[in-house]
Curated annotation (Swiss-Prot):
Protein name listed in UniProt: Ubiquinone/menaquinone biosynthesis C-methyltransferase UbiE
The organism of origin for this protein: Haemophilus ducreyi (strain 35000HP / ATCC 700724)
Record-linked PROSITE patterns: SAM_MT_UBIE (PS51608), UBIE_1 (PS01183), UBIE_2 (PS01184)
A Pfam family per the record: Ubie_methyltran
Example of a GO biological process term: methylation
Taxon lineage: Bacteria, Pseudomonadati, Pseudomonadota, Gammaproteobacteria, Pasteurellales
Function: Methyltransferase required for the conversion of demethylmenaquinol (DMKH2) to menaquinol (MKH2) and the conversion of 2-polyprenyl-6-methoxy-1,4-benzoquinol (DDMQH2) to 2-polyprenyl-3-methyl-6-methoxy-1,4-benzoquinol (DMQH2).
Residues involved in S-adenosyl-L-methionine binding: 82, 103, 131-132, 148
Gene3D superfamilies assigned: Vaccinia Virus protein VP39
Pathway it works in: Quinol/quinone metabolism; menaquinone biosynthesis; menaquinol from 1,4-dihydroxy-2-naphthoate: step 2/2; Cofactor biosynthesis; ubiquinone biosynthesis
E.C. no: 2.1.1.163, 2.1.1.201
Length: 259
């Protein structure tokens, strides 16, 4: 009887996951996250600038500097959304290289495609609607995979990391730019106040959707801490994994290699 009860509890745990602070069935989370990004896609870039005071551009510049991407290489911009990374990598890899902007959300992908075309970024970029857990690419395809502020929204992060590992070429690297845990308590307290009191209000005013930005704050708190994500990447097969705390750990950049 005890064994049966334990087995039932384990099965239920395996079938559920977090959507912010809520516990939901795994098959529900993907649609719930999709609804969030369908809602915010049109003003996603504006909200990034407002909520980070433009600092997200510095975080992204540092990520590009750490990527080691060169002319002629192939880059996967996963959960690439509105295409900030794709625009930069397109110029770096040049005509002989290729960038794939992949996102599971059709609204985000459409905004990204329109934005890059308006900027004249064409020719070496492909757009693919794809689930990070089941990437539709052959083994050993990319020199670099970048996922920026997307991993925390993935239902099965371990499966997604293994999928990223699979599509990387030997010698390739994965970069994960994501919100993390502040390393100083005073900053953590201020950040918590900002996240739960300011973010939803700004979202309500600008996007008319406070709930999506409340989810943003909650999803950050549920995301693995720096050392936990490092361990997850190592379990997925990545080697020489390290991370950099940016803005006192509000954001962290993890980097790992496939050898």
């Amino acid at each position: 009887m005890i064994k049966d009860t334990q087995s039932t509890a384990e099965n239920q745990a395996n079938e559920t996951t977090h959507f912010g602070f809520k516990t939901v069935a795994k098959e529900e989370k993907q649609q719930l996250v999709a609804n969030v990004f369908h809602s915010v896609a049109a003003k996603y870039d504006l909200m990034n600038d407002l909520l980070s005071f433009g600092i997200h551009r510095i975080w992204k510049r540092f990520t590009i500097d750490c990527s080691g991407v060169r002319k002629g290489q192939k880059v996967l911009d996963l959960a690439g959304g509105t295409g900030d990374f794709s625009a930069k990598f397109s110029r770096i890899v040049g005509e002989t290289g290729q960038v794939v902007l992949a996102d599971i959300n059709s609204s985000m992908l459409e905004v990204g495609r329109d934005k890059l075309r308006n900027l004249g970024v064409v020719g070496n970029i492909n757009y693919v609607q794809a689930n990070a857990e089941h990437l539709p690419f052959a083994d050993n395809t990319f020199d670099c995979v970048v996922i920026s502020f997307g991993l925390r929204n993935v239902t099965d992060k371990d499966k997604a990391l293994k999928s990223m590992y699979r599509v990387l070429k030997p010698g390739g690297r994965l970069l994960v730019l994501e919100f993390s845990k502040p390393i100083f308590d005073p900053i953590s307290q201020l950040y918590n106040f900002y996240s739960f009191n300011i973010l939803p209000k700004v979202g309500g005013i600008v996007v008319n959707d406070a709930e999506s930005y409340r989810y943003l704050a909650e999803s950050i708190r549920m995301h693995p801490k720096q050392d936990e994500l490092k361990t997850m990447m190592e379990h997925a097969g990545f080697e020489s994994v390290n991370y950099y705390n940016l803005s006192a750990g509000i954001v962290a950049l993890h980097r790992g290699y496939k050898f």
